[in-house]
Amino acid sequence: MTAVRLKDIRKSYGSVKVIHGVDLDIEEGEFIVFVGPSGCGKSTLLRMIAGLEDISGGTLEIGGEVVNDVPPSKRGIAMVFQSYALYPHMTVYDNMAFGMRIAREKKEEIDRRVRSAASILQLTDYLDRLPKALSGGQRQRVAIGRAICRDPKVFLFDEPLSNLDAALRVATRIEIAKLSEAMPDTTMIYVTHDQVEAMTLADRIVVLSGGRIEQVGAPMELYERPANLFVAKFIGSPAMNILPAKIVDTGAKTTVTLPQDRRVTLDIATPESQKSAAVSFGVRPEDLTIATGEQFIIEGTISIIEALGEVTLLYVEGLSGEEPLIVKLPGNQPYQRGDKVRLTADPAKLHLFDAEGKALR
């Protein structure tokens, strides 16, 4: 088992700073997912851990050893990329065994590792096939198997599902989850822009933006208690609805005014100094419901309906011209475009963010 420690890790290309002092402790056997928009630095951070990018500043430890200047081959890591990079003229067995043969491992040890990895990944029946006879998902599993055969201290995954279609992406994601369960003592670091992968695979998620960590936590912690406006809008699909608001009452509970001069009281404590402060009011689409009485947050007209079978998404245009709110309701719904609706939510499910975007608790 191997822990990974990042201490004030920085990366610059000339005068351009791309990673700004990242501090992160990854525990032994933990499955960590780096997630964020394009250009946030997640792949750069992974490549620095792998040794494929030089570290401009800070300290990287793997298994208690500082590895800043240790070459990639000596770090005890194995990496799986977006591209499978399989040798087309070699069988699955030979592709998985190739690295060990180059390292001059014993034939018996090579065979044991290949067959063990094939068993974990359900590839035993395909060992004699060429890559062209495999599906995209099976090819990616061969690439993962090749990494397993290295018997690494740490697995690094750089967007391994990006080249797969939707169905294969789901199937291969499940295989990676099974792999994590089958190898509970192996530390895994996974990069993706897909929050579904992050939410379903991770023990903890690291949300990155602009080369900085915005929040680290368990998937549901980030979903239910985002640290700031960026995380609130990035985690969750559809994204959290955000409305401009103003605090009018503070204390153990907070009252705000919303567009349409609606007043809403939230189960959030704020100090007296926040009175009259401009804030952002947030509510997730699935936490909104259609109000039947006079108690509601906002009202508007349904402009778009997306019936997805499992759920229905309503896009509600407010009477004051603000951005449409998205309402996520279960199953099929009887509403029509042009219907006027009033929306409400459980006060415990509402969020507030200050002018800098920091969550108010």
Tell what function each PLM region has:
Residues F31, R75-A78, Q82, L86-F230:
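ABC ATPase nucleotide-binding domains
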Residues V35-P37:
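The feature captures the beta-strand-to-loop junction immediately N-terminal to the Walker
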Residues S43-L46, V142:
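ABC ATPase nucleotide-binding domain helices that frame the ATP-binding cleft
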Residues A50:
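Helix-to-loop junction immediately C-terminal to a conserved catalytic motif
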Residues S56-T59, G210, L350:
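Conserved coupling/switch loops of ABC nucleotide-binding domains, chiefly the family-specific signature
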Residues G58-V66:
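Conserved ABC transporter NBD signature motif
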Residues K253-I305, G331-R361:
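Glycine/charge-rich catalytic "coupling/switch" loops of P-loop NTPases
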